[in-house]
Amino acid sequence: SILEENGDAIIENSDSVVAEIDMDEEIVEKVVYLCQKHNKKLFGVVSNMNIAIERKDLLKQFDCLICNQLESSILFSRDFKEISAEELSHTLIDELQQSEFNSLIVTLGEAGSLYVKNNGESGFCQARQIEVKDTTGAGDAFFAGVAIGMTYGKELKEEYA
């Protein structure tokens, strides 16, 4: 496979790596290994929470995971639907520390987004009120912006300032 033949060169020459967590498990494991070997930041996005739950040990190896509020509820087996952003931040910090995940960004739809780190740091960014025409690709664009900022030295608290 390309990853077996050229994975070292690909990862070594990358500034960071973005991975879909629910890809083939062997591929995700190889990507995690190569990122650790070459000291590269690894960002994960989740599409299938059932697979993510099965791979919690792998998720601990990611520098940052991004999901929405419903996905975070599934990931931690809790109902976060009727909870304020502030309360969610405190709860997620506890969950992050127990799970040994590094950091998590949770999108909250029209309310905005929040981040939590396992060191207790957290932040909230209120969404700008705009007229939405189409949300296609919004989550991917958000994820890309976060990953690029963190790749080039921005801290989550700076990105949320």
Language-model segments: which ranges?
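Domain-wide signal for the mature, well-folded portions of proteins, strongly enriched
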Residues: 1, 34-36, 42, 63, ...
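Surface-exposed charge patches
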Residues: 9, 33, 94
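Structural alpha-helical scaffold elements that stabilize or flank donor/cofactor-binding regions
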Residues: 9-10, 57-58, 97
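Short glycine/proline-enriched coil/turn segments at helix->beta-strand junctions
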Residues: 12-13, 39, 61, 100-102, ...
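Conserved beta-alpha-beta core of the PfkB/ribokinase-like small-molecule kinase fold
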Residues: 15-90, 111-113
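Conserved phosphate-binding/catalytic region of the ribokinase-like
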Residues: 51, 78-161
